């Protein structure tokens, strides 16, 4: 089912309109903005990842999901022709597939200028605007960069949840699962988790080693950790996760002389206090922490077009 959230009354009489997407593999958030009255609306469709999906698959999502939503929002069956600018930020938008994604969007939004970029640049623009800063993504996985106000200057490779992704939900899940079964966390926490989640040791091993999307399962344990954050052992685990993220990633950008660090993603958002403690420990100051980049992306593009 497609979800939409109205942030303000949306006008149907439009002039210059822009469409911005923040896309992951499971969900894409789209924000539609009309320049003549300042109103905007966010809608969601299934995820688009040009690295894993074919041109035909992407175009079907655009035609069957995005266009009907736009037509409904704008009360116009020719809604695609009203869009004059499209910015698409996606997790799978590596250099090798940028032209592919641009082509898919151009085929739908023929009247629009199209820009396609990776999710890290989108996060940096949403968090820092046109100012230099350190931008981080902390969700299921993690990523970070030093951004000079225009482009990403340096990106410490996150290496994924097996080799890296410090600070992420998946990394927190690894620490948690390891801790409850190797005895580094108290027995009562292990029993509480197994009972609340109605899961066994064997099922956990199955999900991690034999089922797909082990990273998402590991990250899902962060909900339990957050729920029981009053337990000092779990609070310490969260702190250790963020300390590791700063030590192995953020500290590598210290030579640029910028101390402000900002983050997007549910792990940074819900565990913000621990994130701020880790930042201070390593000599940084937290500027912004947002759960989603979509409104920051819109603010960036509005300012750029003025």
Predicted feature residues:
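Solvent-exposed, flexible loop/coil residues
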Residues: 52-55, 87, 97, 160, ...
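Proline-centered loop/turn at the N-terminus of a beta-strand
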Residues: 85, 113-115, 260
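Glycine-rich beta-strand-to-loop/alpha-helix junction loops that act as flexible
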Residues: 87-94, 138-141, 259-268
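ATP-binding/phosphotransfer module of carbohydrate and carboxylate kinases, centering on a glycine-rich
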Residues: 2-83, 127-134, 175-306
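Phosphate-binding/catalytic loop of phosphoryl-transfer enzymes
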Residues: 93-188
């Amino acid at each position: 089912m497609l979800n939409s959230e109205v942030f303000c009354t949306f006008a149907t009489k439009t002039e210059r309109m822009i469409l911005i997407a923040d896309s992951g593999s499971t969900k894409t958030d789209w924000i539609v903005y009309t320049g003549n009255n300042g109103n905007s609306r966010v809608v969601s469709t299934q995820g688009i990842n040009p690295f894993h999906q074919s041109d035909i698959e992407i175009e079907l999502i655009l035609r069957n999901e995005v266009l009907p939503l736009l037509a409904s929002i704008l009360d116009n069956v020719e809604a695609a022709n009203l869009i004059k600018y499209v910015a698409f930020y996606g997790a799978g938008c590596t250099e090798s597939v940028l032209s592919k994604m641009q082509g898919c969007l151009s085929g739908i939004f023929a009247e629009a200028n199209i820009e396609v970029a990776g999710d890290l640049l989108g996060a940096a623009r949403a968090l820092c605007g046109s100012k230099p800063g350190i931008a981080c993504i902390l969700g299921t996985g993690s990523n970070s960069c030093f951004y000079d106000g225009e482009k990403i200057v340096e990106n410490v490779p996150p290496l994924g949840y097996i080799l890296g992704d410090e600070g992420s939900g998946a990394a927190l899940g690894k620490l948690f699962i390891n801790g409850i079964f190797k005895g580094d966390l108290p027995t009562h926490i292990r029993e509480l988790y197994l009972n609340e989640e109605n899961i066994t040791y064997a099922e956990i091993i199955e999900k991690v080693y034999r089922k797909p999307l082990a990273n998402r399962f590991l990250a899902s344990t962060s909900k339990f950790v957050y729920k029981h954050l009053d337990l000092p052992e779990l609070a310490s685990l969260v702190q250790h996760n963020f300390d590791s993220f700063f030590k192995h990633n953020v500290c590598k950008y210290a030579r640029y002389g910028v101390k402000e660090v900002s983050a997007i993603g549910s792990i940074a958002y819900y565990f913000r206090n621990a994130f701020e403690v880790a930042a201070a420990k390593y000599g940084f100051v937290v500027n912004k922490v947002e759960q989603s980049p979509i409104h920051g992306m819109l603010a960036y593009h509005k300012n750029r077009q003025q």
